[in-house]
Amino acid sequence: MRDSSAVEQKLNQIISADKDKLLVVSDFDYTLSRFHDPEGKSCLTTHGVFDSAAWTVSQELGMILERLKEKYLPIEFDPHITVAEKIPHMEDWWRTSHEHIIKTGFTKKMIQKFVAEAKLELKEGAEELMLMLRDHNVPLIIFSAGIGNVIDFFLRKELGRFPNNIHIVSNMMKYDENDVAVAFSEPLIHTFCKNSAVISRYGSLFSEISSRTCVLLMGDSLGDSKMDVGLECEQVALKIGFLNYNDETLLAKYLDGYDIVLLDDQTMHVPRLILNSIFETERDENLSCINCRLESKKKSHVATEEESVVVNNKVPNLR
C-alpha cells in the first residue's frame, strides 16, 4: 500500500454508500483462483487447463500451445515493454491458441472432464466471498481473458449451482448441435483489453450495473487494474492487486495501478474483511483487522524470497 490515507478515504466512501451502490469486478485466473496450493505446487489457469489436457488428446496441439506460451509469456510480463506494444502480441497469442483449440474439435463433455480433473483451485475464502455477494444481491462481474466455459463449469462444480448475481465476461466457446466447440465469441478478450467497452456489449448487464457507483476491483495483472475504465457511473474504485511472485520492478508498477497490493496471498481475507465492513458485519472489528493486515503487508515493498513462490527463478505457468 503506497498511500494509506487514500485507501482509508476510499474505504470510508464505499462504506458510507448504500450496498445497493456496490459492484465487484474481479479477474478469475490467479485472482479468485489459486496461483499455488498450500504445498507450493503451481495451479492452472483456464487456458492452462487446455495447455495441460492438450497432451492427452494431441501431442501436436500440446507442442503448439507450449511454444506459443514460451514465445509470448515473457512479453506479457516484461515491465520494459509498453501496453501499446504488447497488445498486438497478445492478440496474436490468443487468436492462434483459440484457432488450434477449435481445430481439435473438443466436445462439451471433454471440456467438463478436463475441468473436473484439472488442478484448478479457488483461493481460500473465495467461495464464501461469492456467496456473501449473492446473499447481499451485489453483482460480481468475473472479467476474464481466459476461457469462460471453464470458469462456468468449475464454479458449478465448486458452488453446486451458479449464483444469479455472477456474470462471466470472457472468451466463450460456441457449440454446434453435437456439442462440439466450433468458435470463440467476439470480441476477443486478452489481458490488455479488459474494460467497460467490452462490458457495454452485454446490454442487460450494462443496464443492471448502471447505478453502481462504488467499485471493488480485484486482479493479478497490470491490465486488470484498468477493468473499470469507462464505467460512467463510477464515483470511487478501491483496487486490490495480487502479485503472485517476487519481482521488485513489477511491484513498483503494481503499486502505481492498485491501491492495495498483496504479495503471494492465496486467500480472500482482505477483500472479505472489506465486504464485511460494507455490509455492517462487525464493522469496527473488521476495519481494525483490515488495518492490521495492511500494515503487515507494508513489508511487501521490500519483499523477500520467503514471501513468494518462484520456481527456478522464473515465473511459472502464468497463463
Question: At which residue positions do the language-model features occur?
Answer:
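Alpha-helical substrate-recognition element adjacent to the catalytic core
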Residues: 1-180, 254, 258
